[in-house]
């Protein structure tokens, strides 16, 4: 068990993953991807800035870096995978929801160790916290349909 600031012990899964720390890493990754989208910044600078701040917040730094580097590296591919499920161009999607969708698509494609239901639920919770009033419902609909295509065996199994 690990101690999380402001709370009691946080149970780890059998594989050693602490879900609370992963959730924090996702929230920080959202902020980094959002900053990158808005500023058009250099990927390495954005990661370095947020990784430095991340060190002061209890979170899964390795997972944070994987998410941010993965989204920034595979952004065009992620957008291509999301496009069939959008009702507008990716550029027209609200910047927060766009960042959440890209992070969710990255996890669906490249983090097979994370169940698709966890990916979608975490994306919904993040969109509720940071996005527009109904942004989480849009994120849910898009990622739910994307999961069916990207992880068909897992979703239908």
UniProtKB/Swiss-Prot annotation:
GO MF term (any one): RNA binding
SUPFAM superfamilies: NusB-like
GO cellular component: cytosol
Entry protein name: Transcription antitermination protein NusB
PANTHER family attached to this UniProt entry: ANTITERMINATION NUSB DOMAIN-CONTAINING PROTEIN, N UTILIZATION SUBSTANCE PROTEIN B-RELATED
Gene3D superfamilies on file: NusB-like
Task performed by this protein: Involved in transcription antitermination. Required for transcription of ribosomal RNA (rRNA) genes. Binds specifically to the boxA antiterminator sequence of the ribosomal RNA (rrn) operons.
Family assignment from sequence similarity: Belongs to the NusB family.
Domain of life, per lineage: Bacteria
Keywords: RNA-binding, Transcription, Transcription antitermination, Transcription regulation
One GO term (biological process): transcription antitermination
InterPro entries registered for this protein in UniProt: NusB-like_sf, NusB_fam, NusB_RsmB_TIM44
């Amino acid at each position: 068990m690990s101690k999380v600031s402001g709370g009691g012990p946080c149970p780890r899964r059998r594989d050693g993953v602490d879900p609370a720390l992963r959730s924090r890493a996702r929230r920080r990754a959202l902020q980094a991807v959002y900053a990158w989208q808005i500023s058009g910044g250099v990927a390495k600078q954005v990661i370095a800035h947020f990784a430095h701040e991340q060190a002061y917040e209890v979170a899964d730094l390795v997972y944070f870096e994987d998410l941010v580097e993965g989204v920034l590296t595979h952004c065009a591919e992620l957008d291509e995978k999301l496009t069939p499920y959008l009702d507008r161009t990716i550029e027209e999607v609200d910047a927060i929801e766009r960042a959440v969708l890209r992070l969710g698509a990255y996890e669906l494609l490249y983090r097979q160790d994370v169940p698709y239901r966890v990916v979608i639920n975490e994306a919904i919770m993040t969109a509720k916290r940071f996005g527009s009033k109904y942004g989480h419902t849009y994120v849910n609909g898009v990622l739910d349909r994307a999961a069916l295509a990207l992880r068909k065996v897992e979703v239908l199994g």
